[in-house]
Amino acid sequence: MNPNDPNDPNGLNDPNELDQLIAVAREARQFAYAPYSNFAVGAVVESRDGRLFTGCNVENASYGLTLCAERVALGKAISEGARDLLRVVVIADTRRPIPPCGACRQLILELAGPEAAVVLANLAGDRIVTTSSALLPAAFDRHYL
């Protein structure tokens, strides 16, 4: 990380670090349980202390019960005591880098905060780095409760 980079004040866009995280998410993707859609997704969540939590999508015959890779990884992070989440990476075999669904965007914002880096990637090597607040502008959050 280079916190002195004016284009990356949080030091979250280091290409080598992103390559490593994308590789971890890609590895997690191979464990996807997707017998209905055959659409495998992998994810990794990084905590500020450097721990990594992987996830893959887990489908169900009752489609609404399907778990997205991002939510699996976030759930693992929280269940293992991680509270200061830094980055979320998601990858799939798509033409463009894969964005999280609306439910995942809401959970990423809630658990990782508005400035968390979110990396959208595909198997072709394309990627987009954004933030959770950019993915979910005008979000409903605890301040409305």
Where does each model-flagged region fall?
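C-terminal binding/interaction regions
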Residues: N2-P3, D14-F31, A82-L145
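Intrinsically disordered, low-complexity tandem-repeat regions enriched in Proline and Serine
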Residues: P6-L12
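Extended beta-strand/beta-hairpin segments
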Residues: F31-S37
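Short beta-strand scaffold segments in enzyme catalytic cores
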Residues: N38-S47
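Compact, glycine-rich, soluble single-domain proteins
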Residues: C56-V72
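Feature captures the catalytic cores and cofactor-binding loops of soluble hydro-lyases/lyases
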Residues: V72, K76-E80, Q106-L107
